[in-house]
Amino acid sequence: MNTQQLAKLRSIVPEMRRVRHIHFVGIGGAGMGGIAEVLANEGYQISGSDLAPNPVTQQLMNLGATIYFNHRPENVRDASVVVVSSAISADNPEIVAAHEARIPVIRRAEMLAELMRFRHGIAIAGTHGKTTTTAMVSSIYAEAGLDPTFVNGGLVKAAGVHARLGHGRYLIAEADESDASFLHLQPMVAIVTNIEADHMDTYQGDFENLKQTFINFLHNLPFYGRAVMCVDDPVIRELLPRVGRQTTTYGFSEDADVRVEDYQQIGPQGHFTLLRQDKEPMRVTLNAPGRHNALNAAAAVAVATEEGIDDEAILRALESFQGTGRRFDFLGEFPLEPVNGKSGTAMLVDDYGHHPTEVDATIKAARAGWPDKKLVMLFQPHRFTRTRDLYDDFANVLTQVDTLLMLEVYPAGEAPIPGADSRSLCRTIRGRGKIDPILVPDPAQVAEMLAPVLTGNDLILVQGAGNIGKIARSLAEIKLKPQTPEEEQHD
């Protein structure tokens, strides 16, 4: 670390100059990798471990980080601090070694809180829409010339990274409620997009506990801070009197401080008007489909307006918004003749949504933008507990597509739960008499089982949070065409 870099560190986080080497366990995750990327750009020595390489680890290696694709005690040697993701168990050999060596072990959000401590922090929380809203706020602030630092849970496509170190005073970050670690953050501004039952194992299955945790998060704001909240959400509307901070509401509701009206979707773009108190109406063209994205944009505009950002900069940022990775991510449109001999094409869209509300929003956006297309979904449930807890909601939402192919549940480390598997979910959906789902027992069979159901005027939604994103990219690479054994060997 050279003198210039040390001077920069003293100006940003004065006491962290005592820290030289930061080690991340589970560094390949988007949230972990984003923080590591910011710290690498600040001049810290970064190392980390994960089980397999991915684009996040490659980006960090390009920045000079040392990455180990194993978990061994010697990996933490000489570390000043060890940062651990919530997915890592306490008996991980690196965690055990760090404790034995009396090296501090902290969670991801604690390190994010240190980055935020000496900046003007803007934290985006909520069950759905965090990643996209974080990207929208970051895009607006960048367009306004404010050069923000951002740390996002997904790839910000315009920047090509999950995180970026800016030279301005703003830090814009996604705040994760899945393990309640967002309580470490002390931002100046907090957005809450919505609150639904998810990650309930963290909250002992008690929804009241989850709601109180969001209130506690908002109470981390200083008395002069601001909470920006979606008043369309019934839980948020219920909690508003308990926030105890200055609030700005947004939504389609007539009493919203920033109100969305006249929404219309044309293809991948949304067009709507935003009504703000004491401001001229703002006519927005948003380069992202769906009413849910209009709400995300309204949250970003509410924050930017409060900061005094020029309307023209806001409008430019939203019209040119390139989205985030795996959020209604258009991967291509492919001719079907090589796939199944039919004329016409099929569009391929990859989406991370894995909660019934998110899946429903994606389906509605697809129907609104491409009403004449057959909607084909390849869905991978994520976690047995979520499938069990939201079973009926999944069954209801998934019947809205024209054709459904379903992979086995992605376990994310969980043990199987009887009745919360994909075969059971397919059986339940079939029993409702609207569609006949197709169970795909092996991911290698996806292209082969997808080809016969395509008609030549299709929109394929590849939906889920597990490893299904890799399957989507594979389908794009082979242009949906099932591979012969010879072609697979050649690949």
Swiss-Prot record:
Gene name linked to the record: murC
HAMAP family, per the entry: MurC
Protein's name according to its UniProt entry: UDP-N-acetylmuramate--L-alanine ligase
Stated role: Cell wall formation.
Protein EC: 6.3.2.8
Pathway(s) this gene product operates in, as recorded in its UniProt entry: Cell wall biogenesis; peptidoglycan biosynthesis
Pfam families listed in its UniProt record: Mur_ligase (PF01225), Mur_ligase_C (PF02875), Mur_ligase_M (PF08245)
NCBIfam families per record: murC
InterPro entries to which the protein is assigned, alphabetical: Mur-like_cat_sf, Mur_ligase_C, Mur_ligase_C_dom_sf, Mur_ligase_cen, Mur_ligase_N, MurCDEF_pg_biosynth, UDP-N-AcMur_Ala_ligase_MurC
Family named by the database record: Belongs to the MurCDEF family.
Keyword list, A-Z: ATP-binding, Cell cycle, Cell division, Cell shape, Cell wall biogenesis/degradation, Cytoplasm, Ligase, Nucleotide-binding, Peptidoglycan synthesis
Reaction it catalyzes: UDP-N-acetyl-alpha-D-muramate + L-alanine + ATP = UDP-N-acetyl-alpha-D-muramoyl-L-alanine + ADP + phosphate + H(+)
Residues engaged in binding ATP: 126-132
Top EC class, one word: ligase
CC annotations in GO: cytoplasm
GO terms (BP aspect): cell division; cell wall organization; peptidoglycan biosynthetic process; regulation of cell shape
Subcellular location per the Swiss-Prot or TrEMBL entry: Cytoplasm
Main location group: cytoplasm
Species of the source: Escherichia coli O1:K1 / APEC
GO MF, any single term: ATP binding
